[in-house]
Amino acid sequence: MTIKEAITNADSLQNNNFNQPMKIKWLSELEEKIMNEQFATHETLNEYEMRDWILYIRNMFLPLYTDDEETKENLEWDFDENTELLAPLEYQGMYTTYLLSKYALHSGEYERYSIFENKFSTEYQNFCNYINRTYKPLQKNKIEVS
């Protein structure tokens, strides 16, 4: 699923006045969450390459764990409508639900937001469970013998 497809799905379910760059920003925030919480903490497929504190994936550089504000500000985000989203097909519904929750939150529809946010949380947890079942956690522990 591409960013454009996720946005089209969400827009077909709920009319809204949010512009395309805002929707892309929301989806990029979710992708960053997925990478920081899942891909950075698990062994990944060959197409994912770790480089110090930056993850290079599908022609994008994305930050992992960093507290350096200057570094965060200087990173260029290269998300456009044709960017493929990370989740496998069976978990891609969470992108639509995530956008619907953002639409409701920023429109002041807090009851709808609560419903969509709960649904998104369940879908995201199912995706996390899939990652945990499929990939081994990164092992950074060491035993030193004196």
Show which residues each predicted segment covers:
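Generic structural signal for hydrophobic core residues of well-folded globular domains
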Residues: I34, Q38, K102-S107
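Short, positively charged, low-complexity/disordered linker segments
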Residues: A87-L89, A104, G108-E109
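Short, hydrophobic/amphipathic alpha-helical patches that form generic packing surfaces
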Residues: G93-L105
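Short conserved catalytic/interaction loops centered on acidic-Pro-aromatic/His motifs
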Residues: G108-E117
